[in-house]
Curated annotation (Swiss-Prot):
Species whose genome carries this gene: Anaeromyxobacter dehalogenans (strain 2CP-C)
Pathway assigned to this chain's UniProt record: tRNA modification; tRNA-queuosine biosynthesis
Keyword S-adenosyl-L-methionine assigned: yes
Keyword Amino-acid biosynthesis: no
Highest taxon above the source species: Bacteria
GO molecular function: S-adenosylmethionine:tRNA ribosyltransferase-isomerase activity
Protein name: S-adenosylmethionine:tRNA ribosyltransferase-isomerase
Family annotation (InterPro entries): QueA, QueA_dom1, QueA_dom2, QueA_sf
Pfam families cross-referenced by the UniProt entry: Queuosine_synth
Length: 345
């Protein structure tokens, strides 16, 4: 299977540079079961498109100010992106991406406006293992001072005060992500209330978003691509909600590709098992979806693991045709863009 089969032309002007207000004012393309044409709705219409007994599954990870700009002991400039907490939550040990004018060496101490990081290991390809000089609430405060919101590079502006709130879901709880689970950015409290009144239930899992989600695929052979691991957790309460939804015949509606990957990774012996884990699952066409019946997702980059996942879920030809229609109709793409609802039943 070739990466070049997952390409499409996207005018630069359709890449959303800022969020809409309110959050649920974004557009929603709907791909229902069968071969019919996509429907074009607003995201605020979501309660009408789901049924009583369905279960929405959110990713409750919280984006941290993970981009750090500082100096090495020599005075040279260095940039670090905290990608994966190795101890869970805001611990001291992290996997990070780094760049500097000269190589970053093992044992180096990097300073970021009062926060220090010691390089414990050089993994190669720009990845490092580092130990920070604080953890927990002290680390959260230090990142608030020294860190920046890690907006994706296709947002061609500096982060501002609005991004601190808008590049975060309203239910974000567990700090640790270097990117937002963007399908969740469309939800508002009034929309959640309307979904609940409709009889749609909700629960949350946690996957800390890192390079496994946002790094590009190198080369054209999909079978040769290896995902970077990302840590996830399914609570016993979430596992029970998922089992109950199955028992009553409700659909499992994953909000975002990270929720899809969490649920599919945690599938054991006919159910989603509770507990922590680390996933390197690369979902591509041919994957046997077991845990998910529907998904909400944004419009993704050409030639990305995220687009490949959506094609696996909704059918490659149908999804790519829908993307071409989205371009023709002026849908907004990527993190701050519009959304798609894909239903398998």
């Amino acid at each position: 299977m070739r990466l070049s089969d997952f390409d499409f032309a996207l005018p630069e002007g359709l890449v959303a540079q800022a969020p809409v207000t309110p959050r649920d004012a974004s557009r929603l393309m709907v791909l229902a079961p069968g071969e019919g044409a996509p429907a074009h709705r607003g995201f605020a219409d979501l309660p009408e498109l789901l049924a009583p007994g369905d279960l929405l599954v959110f990713n409750d990870t919280r984006v941290i100010p993970a981009r750090l700009l500082g100096h090495k002991a020599s005075g040279g400039k260095v940039e670090l992106l905290l990608c994966e907490p190795l101890e869970g939550g805001l611990g001291r040990r992290w996997r990070a991406m780094g760049q500097a004018s000269k190589p970053i060496r093992e044992g180096a101490v990097l300073a970021f406006d009062g926060l220090e990081a010691r390089v414990d290991a050089v993994e190669g390809e720009g990845f490092y293992r580092v130990t920070l000089d604080r953890q927990g609430a002290e680390l959260e405060a230090a990142l608030g001072r020294a860190g920046r919101i890690p907006l994706p590079p296709y947002i061609r502006r500096a982060p501002d005060a609005e991004d601190a709130a808008r590049y975060q879901t309203i239910w974000a709880r567990a700090p640790g992500s270097a990117a937002a689970p963007t399908a969740g950015l469309h939800f508002t409290e009034p929309l959640l209330a309307r979904l609940a009144a409709r009889g749609v239930r909700r629960t949350a899992v946690t996957l800390h978003v890192g390079p496994g989600t946002f790094l590009p695929i190198r080369g054209d052979d999909l079978d040769a691509h290896r995902m970077h691991g990302e840590r996830y957790e399914v609570s016993p309460a979430a596992a029970a909600e998922l089992a109950a939804a199955r028992a009553r015949g409700g659909r499992i509606v994953a909000v975002g590709t990270t929720s899809v990957r969490t649920l599919e990774s945690a599938w054991r012996d006919g159910e989603v098992a509770p507990g922590p884990g680390r996933t390197e699952l690369f979902i591509r066409p041919g994957h046997p979806f077991r845990a998910v019946d529907a998904m909400v997702t944004n419009f993704h980059l050409p030639r990305s693991t995220l687009l490949v996942l959506v094609c696996a879920f909704g059918g490659q030809g149908r999804v790519l045709a829908a993307y071409r229609e989205a371009v023709a109709r002026g849908y907004r793409f990527f993190s701050y863009g519009d959304a798609m609802l894909l239903l398998r039943r």
